[in-house]
């Protein structure tokens, strides 16, 4: 059969992958990170990809919670501007104690801060002159926002996060099905 021969030729040239999607409730980034690490440890898993291991820059991943100083260093934004963003984020979520206490110890996941920042930009606060960003900073933020949106589009919906596993197993067979049972127990 021509189709089988073509598939075999493709597999011989490019290799074959057995990709599996794991869907979990969204929002608990720390649990997702632990699960990805646990899944990656299995010898049957070549790679595991989820929001909690998508690198943004300088070793940080999308779900890392950063202080204003860390966010400032990541984005090359002025520290005072980052403090303002963190205060606005806290106020938006009615976490006023964060504003009154030391905002410098408040940590927000990168993905959440960027979504808030772009909502903030979209609402026109930057354009109204409350906060001014230079062109380079604005360009860097646009690039990071694109990365984040691409990852989120592929790996998260409103209620669920998707993790993609590339397995070092055939698509079917006893070993594969036994490993799927193991995955069900772990997840």
Feature annotation, model-predicted:
Residues 17-19, 36, 45, 157-162:
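Active-site lining segments that contact anionic ligands and/or coordinate catalytic metals
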Residues 24-26, 167:
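Short beta-strand segments enriched in hydrophobic/aromatic residues
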Residues 29-37, 171-178:
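Short, conserved charged micro-motifs
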Residues 33-66:
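Short amphipathic beta-strand/extended segments in non-transmembrane regions
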Residues 111-187:
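Extracytoplasmic
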């Amino acid at each position: 059969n021509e189709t089988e021969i073509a598939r075999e030729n493709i597999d011989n040239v490019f290799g074959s992958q057995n990709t599996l999607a794991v869907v979990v409730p969204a929002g608990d980034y720390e649990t997702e990170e632990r699960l990805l690490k646990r899944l990656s440890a299995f010898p049957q898993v070549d790679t595991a990809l989820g929001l909690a291991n998508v690198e943004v820059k300088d070793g940080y991943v999308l779900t890392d919670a950063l202080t204003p100083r860390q966010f400032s260093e990541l984005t090359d934004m002025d520290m005072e501007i980052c403090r303002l963003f963190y205060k606005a984020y806290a106020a938006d979520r009615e976490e006023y104690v964060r504003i009154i206490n030391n905002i410098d110890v408040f940590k927000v996941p990168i993905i959440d801060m960027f979504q808030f920042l772009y909502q903030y930009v979209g609402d026109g606060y930057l354009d109204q002159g409350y906060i001014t960003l230079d062109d380079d900073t604005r360009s860097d933020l646009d690039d990071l926002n694109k990365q984040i949106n691409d990852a989120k589009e592929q790996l998260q919906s409103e209620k669920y996060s998707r993790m993609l596993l590339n397995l070092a197993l055939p698509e079917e067979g006893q070993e594969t099905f036994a490993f799927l049972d193991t995955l069900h127990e772990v997840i």
